Amino acid sequence: QYLSHDGIDFYHRYKEDLKLFKEMGFNCFRTSIAWGRIFPDGDEELPNEAGLKFYDDLIDEIIRNGMEPVITLSHYETPLHLLCEYGGWISPKMITFWHRYITTVFNRYKGKVKYWLTFNEVNAMLRNPMIAAGVLHIDDPQYKDDAKKSITPKDVWTAYRNILIANADTVYTGHQIDAENRIGAMMTASGTATYPENCDPD
């Protein structure tokens, strides 16, 4: 049955995991902050302190184990309420909600986190807008059996435009809060991994 086990259970076992990574000699550790843990519905005025406390502890533990935290701000987890209420990134209101989230996080971890990724595989939404950008007409009765079919090319490009505006705002805001921040988006390849024939760079 789906979700019948705990997977790696990182939420409860991250201290053990980070000790193992330290033993392996890692000098950085990439993880994600779930937007919905900080703003459960996504459009609240005030953040969820319990959610922030988890990331306080996680980031401190990464640093304690001698690793540089590399934080992804969005990794395919747009809060469900934003999808249901606004259609996800189709709505320009998402830019305002996103700004509140990233400002909260940048201020909270100023001086602790230097390396930031805005959107994981930001260009993946062109192929899979529902997963990558939370784009869905979830309440459209015409598509009750397959809501993904309701997504039009215009929806996709509108959402992508809003995400790119939010991405630019993230870079600007992050540098305003801490000029030492290094911020960029993660890109995905064409969908097919390719590897060289051998390790010779020529």
Functional labels for PLM-detected ranges:
Residues 33-37:
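Active-site gating/metal-coordination segments in enzymes
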Residues 1-14, 18, 22-27, 39-202:
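Non-catalytic scaffold segments within catalytic domains of secreted glycoside hydrolases
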